[in-house]
Amino acid sequence: MSFSDLMTGLMVIFMFVAISYILEVQKAEQQRQKVVTDFQDSKSAIYKDLRSAFDEEKKEWEMEIGKDLSIRFTNPQVIFALGKSDVTPTFQKILNDFLPRYFNILLKEEYRTRIKEIRIEGHTDTLAIYSKSSDPYIGNILLSQERSAKVLEYFRQMEYYKNLSEKQKEQLQYWITANGLSYGRTLDDNKQESFLSHEPINANYSRRVEFRIITTSEELIENIVNDMQK
């Protein structure tokens, strides 16, 4: 075999190896893109389900549905009395209608692997609650935490929750957290976070409860990055 024949054979082998590698890279990229697309489609589907379920009640309940999968109740007079954590009768009536429909959506099998956490968030204005702490921020942390916990407690006492299967209850206990954010994320007159907008705080809008769905997007991105580093 001549030297030129040997080189030709090596070039052919190298070409096939290169083509095989390129095809594997393209296949992996297509698989990653499919995972991302499926995830984005699921997030969009959850948002559409929430809009479809509650669009008619938004105005009556003074509720906002965000594309970030947050639901915000912004009428403080309806939700809690000033400085108190007990759920008002008016808000109880809203929760009786809202919570079963909300969790019926999230407990769908197709969303089970897409949800990482369901946050019940309590938010306050900057009014100091010295009965709870000499530090106004901590006093409002405690108040907002109590409020979110009261909402969760109310949900767990509902007949809807009691009638769920044990598997569904375990799933919700894994997902749901009650969080108090004090006045760390107050809102302005446009219901935007005042820290980011640099606008004056609207105390009424800031006193609120939010339900927020945290998806598994961070885990998805981490897995993709790990795959790319292999």
Residue ranges of predicted features:
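Surface-exposed acidic, glycine-flexible loop patches that form ligand/cofactor-binding
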Residues: 62, 107-112, 167-168, 199-202
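Short, solvent-exposed beta-strand/turn patches at coil↔beta or beta↔helix junctions
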Residues: 67-98, 127-140
